[in-house]
Curated annotation (Swiss-Prot):
Its EC number is 2.7.7.18. GO terms for biological process: NAD biosynthetic process. It catalyses: nicotinate beta-D-ribonucleotide + ATP + H(+) = deamido-NAD(+) + diphosphate. Belongs to the NadD family. Keywords: ATP-binding, NAD, Nucleotide-binding, Nucleotidyltransferase, Pyridine nucleotide biosynthesis, Transferase. It is an enzyme of class 2 (transferase). SUPFAM superfamilies: Nucleotidylyl transferase (SSF52374). This is Probable nicotinate-nucleotide adenylyltransferase. It holds the Pfam family CTP_transf_like. InterPro entries: Cyt_trans-like, NadD/NMNAT, Rossmann-like_a/b/a_fold. Pathway: Cofactor biosynthesis; NAD(+) biosynthesis; deamido-NAD(+) from nicotinate D-ribonucleotide: step 1/1. GO terms for molecular function: ATP binding; nicotinate-nucleotide adenylyltransferase activity. The gene is nadD. Catalyzes the reversible adenylation of nicotinate mononucleotide (NaMN) to nicotinic acid adenine dinucleotide (NaAD).
Length: 189
């Protein structure tokens, strides 16, 4: 079983998130993509984070199609950090080939995540191009530190079979939706 893990606060979820998940599903030849809705992103302010139930409902609207699963596993596990979640899931499901999925905007700030180097060594990582983030992502501390482990995009279909560290940067049609922009419009309107 090849499973993509797409974590985020999804505050709110939007078509750009769906684009990332669908791109990963197709290009990585995954059986499932699990959207891990974070109870609270430790790098973001809690006062602007919508309630978990509201964000879960929003993700369900966008996580359509076969193989898309919405999960509050981090809440149930009491896990606040991706590295802890990955370790628990890998221990519980040793036969599953997990891939961490993120947008390029997340790779640009990945070095701020707790245990980011361990994440890269725990599971293969797929980075999906996002508008305005390509240069920052490709020159980020994480991209530089793990340049030796970057695979060509033509090998994306076998990334799940790789031993970490291994990562791929996938380009293609871009989706310009943004949670930040959506929140800005909602506060103004």
């Amino acid at each position: 079983m090849r499973v993509g893990l797409f974590g985020g606060s999804f505050n709110p979820a939007h078509e750009g998130h769906a684009h990332v998940a669908e791109t990963a599903m197709h290009r990585l030849k995954l059986d499932k993509v699990i959207w891990l809705v974070s109870p609270q992103n430790p790098l973001k302010s809690s006062h602007e984070t919508r309630p978990l139930a509201e964000r879960m409902a929003g993700v369900r609207r966008w996580a359509r199609g076969g193989g898309m699963i919405v999960s509050d596993a981090e809440t149930r596990l009491g896990s606040q950090y991706t590295i802890d979640t990955l370790r628990v899931l890998r221990a519980r499901y040793p036969g599953v080939k997990f891939v961490w999925i993120m947008g390029a905007d997340s790779l640009a700030t990945f070095h701020r995540w707790r245990g980011w180097t361990q994440i890269m060594r725990e599971v293969p990582v797929a980075v999906i191009s996002r508008p305005w983030a390509a240069l920052k992502a490709r020159t980020s501390p994480a991209a530089r530190r793990f340049a030796h482990a970057r695979w060509p995009s033509s090998a994306a279909a076998i990334l799940a079979d790789a031993t970490a560290p291994a990562w791929v940067y996938l380009t293609g049609p871009l989706n310009f939706a943004s949670s930040t922009a959506l929140r800005g419009r909602q506060t103004k309107g």
